[in-house]
Amino acid sequence: CFKTDFGERIPVDVVYHDGSDPQAMHNYYTYLYNQAVFNLLKEVKGENEAVLFARSATAGSQKFPVHWGGDCSANYPSMAETLRGGLSFAMSGFSFWSHDISGFESTATPDLYKRWCAFGLMSTHSRLHGSGSYRVPWLFDDEACEILKEFVNLKCRLMPYLYGQAVCSHKEGRPVLRPMFLDFPEDRACDTLDRQYMFGDSLLVAPIFKENGEVQYYLPEGTWYNLITGAEVAGGKWQKETHDYHSLPLMVRPNSILPLGNNDQKPDYDYADGVSLLVSAFDEGAEAKTEIPDLKGETVMTVTAKRVGDEIHLHVEGGNGNYTVKSLSGCKVVVEA
């Protein structure tokens, strides 16, 4: 991976060697700027191994394929603005997005740092970065080290799910981190939500933007489960909760299968070996499917589920047979051969 900063501050009072119009080149230049580095990485690392981490972007830049949100400030309003920018970015066709955890400008309070760590680790890509001071957790307080570790561990366990979502995004173009209305177009309450998001097909995230830990978020219809606390929450209405630094609304969607890996120490491992399959609440007749890839992005395990009466029938294809199944709702899960 190579980080390209800048590329967007292109003056219009210049003369291009090939006679290009300086006004027309303003957006296109950033594409060429990042493409040059990306193509070099492809030559060195291979077609499917090149990764660019860029700030500037324009139409078509999603192929490079990771970007971050630029120089945000270390305060809660800027944290919320950062998410709004990411949601807009997603609706412009960009699948992978990051931001400077705890803000780039100024230095965050320990409180803000810990809240932003949870948000940052529940983004597709995560980076601690800033101006004028280091963003390592031990410079804030001991609890910051605990919080960062917990969410890093959680993200590592989520990698079978997240990498599977990344592969799906690569094939279909749906952004991994996206606004609610993309998944729930018929629910008008989702039209203007900009303080929460879907994190792939099966998870909803509502970052906390208040020092007192209060958060209000909306859940569409169905029975949802907080992945961290285990709480069951009825959808179809707004929720108001208070969370400590160790949790936030990280909700498992109804009618879904969430794979959790067996490794919380690193992001790259055998995702199918020892995977835990979390089966959420299923409506009568509802079906779900999830695919678990290997590190090359090839599907090695396919899991399908369907609610039949009082049971959820689960079918597993591929893998090495080393997996566990957990029903979040308590509904009996029957594993079919």
Language-model segments: residues:
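Active-site neighborhood of glycoside hydrolase catalytic domains
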Residues: 1-56, 60
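A short amphipathic beta-strand at an alpha->beta junction
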Residues: 331-337
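Catalytic core of carbohydrate-active enzymes
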Residues: 38-44, 49-50, 57-68, 81-85, ...
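Acidic, His- and aromatic-enriched active-site or binding-groove loops in soluble protein domains
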Residues: 21-34, 68-88, 200
